Amino acid sequence: MIRAILTNAALCLSVFLYSSCQSGDKNSLILENTTGLERAGELIVLKKDWLENKLGKISKEKYVVVADKEGQFATVQYDDLDKDGAWDEIALLQSFKPNEKKSFLLSIADQPATIKAVVRAHARHSRKNADNTFGPDLMMDSIPAAQPATDFTKQAYPPFLTEGPAWENDKTGFRLYFDVRNGKDIWGKTTAKMMLDEVGTDTSRNYHQLADWGMDILKVGTSLGAGALALAVQTNNGKDSLIRLGGVNMGKVYYEKICDGPVRAIIRLRYPEWKVMDGIDAVNVTDEISIWGGQYFYESKVTVNNAPGDSKLVTGIVNLYNHAINKIDTAGSAIAYTWGKQSENKDNLGMAIVAAANDIETISKLPEENKTVTNTYTVTFKPSLKKEVNFRFYAGWEKSDDAFKTASGFKDFLVNQAVLKKEKIIIK
């Protein structure tokens, strides 16, 4: 939606903001980058109770607007995370020079600021209509156990647009196969525009081939693809086994969109009926996926309940071309990554999983004798963390950014990302 800033109001606000921030007024917001690195697209999230400590009580129908010292309003997203009809957090994106400090004014308003907002993050999921068009974007959906994968030899269109939920930002994109495969795939993007409402709606335009916006750049097969999930367990016969979150035993799956653009998008996938093996109760898994503008990753927060006591949560990176798995331990993060000619466009693609170093037990190549998951480098989390795990999955395609054209460029990028992950923007 395009709106115009009211110039006179902005000029008046600019004068007030300058004096307020100079005097340390409670209405001021200070953001500081304490690193010597540039930071692009930093997500700033301010909870409502934190804002009320500064501004006083904020009634349900009111908003908080954010303006810089020139009176220019920031694009702010108001997210109702608990679905009670009132926003709980505001989210905005800011970029910083090395060691830069920024000052803003916070104000309670009757409505959001009237500005031109560029959408930098989006999630969508829609079902196919009888006429082979696709319906509206769904806030909630579910599939039964044993939802089959699409057989494109028998039907031109899948039951869901691009076979399931997709999430993107202005740099990259991802999707989930909403069926028994339950795999995660990568959209390589060459445009900042949101494209995934259009991709896949016309079968004459093959998204496996390079287009002006990009393409599907990953072959997943029976691997863990781009950060799919599995559980390492000891089976009833005492053998260690890796059981993917997929197949008939995955049970019913629930999809919910939590929030959507212009700043960030969050979706939640629930798997409450996963029969990991015979003789135990169903395991309950929730995968909450976030993406925001300016980044080459999605972030996954996984919670697991009722898992066997000795089990370990596992995620992974597809390994179809036998590129080496590289490991870096830096700035409190463990990084597992591959790089090389492994995109479906036959050019360079870097993929990485980044998580807290203290959370990871092993990074390894999956043995070839494993049958339920194949061609995968695995990241196994410590057993003590099976109730909640956080990780980021990165996709660095050379057509998205020249930094990813070389192995050293991708490595340097990941090392810097670990520093930025550790050294948060100071908010006060």
Regions inferred by a protein language model and the residue ranges of each:
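Bacterial Sec-dependent N-terminal signal peptides
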Residues: 1-30
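Alpha-mannosidase-like glycoside hydrolase catalytic domains involved in N-glycan trimming
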Residues: 24-146, 150-155, 162
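Polysaccharide-binding surfaces and accessory modules of carbohydrate-active proteins
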Residues: 24-34, 313-365
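Solvent-exposed beta-strand/loop surfaces of large extracellular or lumenal domains
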Residues: 60-88, 277-280, 321-337, 358-369
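Beta-strand-rich recognition/accessory modules
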Residues: 82-97, 354-428
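Solvent-exposed N-terminal domain segments of exported/luminal and surface proteins
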Residues: 112-246
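Extended, loop-rich substrate-binding clefts of extracytoplasmic carbohydrate-active enzymes
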Residues: 212-292
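Acidic (Asp/Glu-rich), glycine- and aromatic
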Residues: 285, 289-291, 296-330
